[in-house]
Amino acid sequence: DAHTVHALDAAGGKELWRFTAGGRVDSPPTLHEGLVLFGSMDGRVTCLRATDGELVWRFLAAPHDRRIGAFDQIESVWPVHGSVLVRAGVAYVTAGRSTYMDGGIRLYGLEPATGRIVHRGLLEGPHRRIDGQRDVAFYVPGANSDVLVGEGGRIYMRQKPLTPELKEIDTEVLSSKGEADVGLHVFSTSGLLDGSWYNRTFWMYSKRWPGFQLANQAPKTGQLLVADEQTTYAVRVFYRRNVHSPMFFPGREGYLLFADRNTTEPQIVGEAGSRPPVQWLPQSDYARGRGDQMVKLGSKAFGGDKMIGYTRADPALWMLWLPVRIRAMVKTRDVLFVAGPPDLYDPKEPFAAIEGRKGAVLVAVSPQTGQEIGRTTLDVPPVFDGMIAAPGRLFASLIDGTVVCLPGRSQP
């Protein structure tokens, strides 16, 4: 919120330099060959020298320098996310909020050293007329802006696949429920920076955009993901469900941490090629009709309402229930770290733990077996997705604005 990027000494935490941008920076900067690249809410991309924070170049990605009031600050009509995607020597950024607003979302591929435009594109609309072309029910052909992701030679913005030259790639809509084959990549249906944990939104590492379908029973799906070359690690918060919505009850089973092979894909029961689903989560009951009859979540009755949604045909590699509200997660070579407030429920102060007033817990887990290796406490919880690892050290950004460094066993 202070529009500021800080460089700290990794060993002692001393501030080495700081740089103030023209708008807030909503996600971590990108380091590339001695440069610090980041976007900001004033519609610009900035490049600094990593050694001393000196400005190398600045690029206006917004089509005009026009400002509006947004989220208690003055921002560009076309903001730029903080994290910049660098692929094959090109820095990719977007400027804009939605393909349906203000002329759409501008796309740029820039030369990191100079800011020179290498590629450019535009995602705009589509704007349908009432008497014109109609879209498949539950499929939204437009998109909101998000941090860019690179996978398999493509650039992705949520459900929008792009070529490295920033040309949009057509996707196949698979059913009237709005599922689409968008290509394998990590995405969030509400945006990778959304930490609100609305119960019908999901992070997924999948080929499919879920559309109308719920994904609370799917593999490689949860409220936060980490993936390496072979395995995806996920946090599942809403593992119960009534008819329409996934549910969670604080202070009961805890939060589910689990692992899947990257080759395990979600499936819809009954579609061509699907296999019998694995029942792996606590199943919920719900009232059907107006009577007292109760049927299980796996019932065919779901076919007439919200349906089961995506399921799995192969079991998870491992599952671990933890009494920790996991808000941050990072994997090193041989340890998976998760951190967050304890899963406590006090009837007198029901939101105390969730709001961070009960401290936090950091847990180390074996990525191979799912066994807990160790744990420690933190005075303050991390911000959402606010933990990284560097050689021999673990860094966390906390909700009180501080940064902590936890040394590894070999560090002093």
Which ranges hold each PLM region?
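Noncatalytic, solvent-exposed loop/strand surfaces
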Residues: 1-412
